[in-house]
Amino acid sequence: MPMQHQAPVSDMAQQAASCELPGRMFRAYDIRGIVGRDLTEDNIRVIGQAIGYLALSHGHNEVLFGADGRLSSPSLSAALGEGILDSGCHIIDLGTIPTPLLYFATHTTDYHSGVMLTASHNPADYNGIKIVRERSCLTSEEIQGIREQACFFARRPDKVREPRLPRGSRRALDIMPAYIDRIRQDVKLKRPLRVVVDCGNAVPGLVAPSLYRALGCEVIELYCQLDGSFPNHHPDPTINVNLKDLVAQVKTHSADLGVALDGDGDRVVLVTDQGRVMDTDRLLMLLVDQILPGYCATAEDRRPSVVFDVKCSSLLINRI
C-alpha cells in the first residue's frame, strides 16, 4: 500500500500538538471519552479515517466493525464508519454486538483487523473505540499514532485517500450463530443448570441468554433488555453494589449460578448458588484446575504458559 498519505513525522507531531482531538482520549490500549466533550461526530470521523489508513498501510483493505448498545452508539457508529470508508477501506459490518464476538470474528474469518465502538464498563455518557490489527490490540505507541494521523487528516482532508483508490463499501456479516455454535461444541455440561444472567441492560443481553440456552441451561434473564441509559445499575460487575439484584435473584430462584457481564461483554463475575460473589482469583483457579491437566496430558513437549494480569494474587500463582 502506498504511504504517500502520511505526513512527515515532524509535521505530524506539530499537527498533534495543535490538534483539537483531546489527548486524554487516547489511552494505553484504546480510545475513550465523554460524548459531546471528547467524542463528537466530527472528530470520530477523522479517527475513522486514521484507522482505515492504518489498516490499508498494513495491507488490509477490509475491517470488521461492531458497536455496543449505548445511546450514543448509532450516531457515533455512523460517523466512525464514514471515516473508515473515506480512507478507501471496506467495512464488514457485524452490527450491534458484544466485543468478544468481534475478537472471535478476527480469529475465525479471513478478516484479521477490526474496530469496536464501545466504552466497555464505563458510565452511559462515555463511548470509545477498541482496535484490533492482526488479531492483536494496538500498543500505546500505535494508539498515539492514530491520534497523530487523525490530526493530520483533520488539517489536510485532501490527503485522506489516495486519488486512484475508490471510497470503501460496506457489507453485513452475522457472526452470532458461528460464535454460539463454536462454544456449544467446546462446552459440554454434565447436567442442566439453572442460571441467572444479568446483562445490566447492555449489549451482552443480545447474545448471552441465547448462548446459555444453547448449552442446555434454564435461563432467568435479569436486565437483558437493551437500554443504553443503564437504568438499573452501572454496567460494571466488578463493583459489588451492582450485583445485589443478581445475588437476590439467584437465591429467589434457587439457581445454580449467577452470571454478571459488563457493558460490552468482556468482563464476567460469577455468583454461587449460595449467593456468594466469586472473586477473579477463585474463578481463574477453577479454570486452571479444569484446563491445565488436560493440556499437560496432550502437550508433553513443552510446559504450558498461563497469562494473568497484575491484579491477581499470589494464591493464583501458587495454584498454577
Kindly give the residue locations of the regions a language model identified.
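Proline/glycine-rich low-complexity loops and linkers
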Residues: 101, 144-181, 185, 273-320
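Residues that mark the start of a beta-strand
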Residues: 60-64, 192-196, 218, 302-305
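Short, surface-exposed alpha-helical segments at coil->helix boundaries
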Residues: 73-78, 143, 205-209, 317
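Gly/Ser/Thr-enriched, mixed-charge loops and adjacent short helices
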Residues: 127-253
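N-terminal small/polar loop signature for handling phosphorylated ligands or for N-terminal nucleophile
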Residues: 57-126, 181, 211-271
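A short, N-terminal amphipathic alpha-helix
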Residues: 47-60, 248-252, 289-298
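An N-terminal, well-structured beta->alpha segment
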Residues: 2-82, 86-87, 172-193
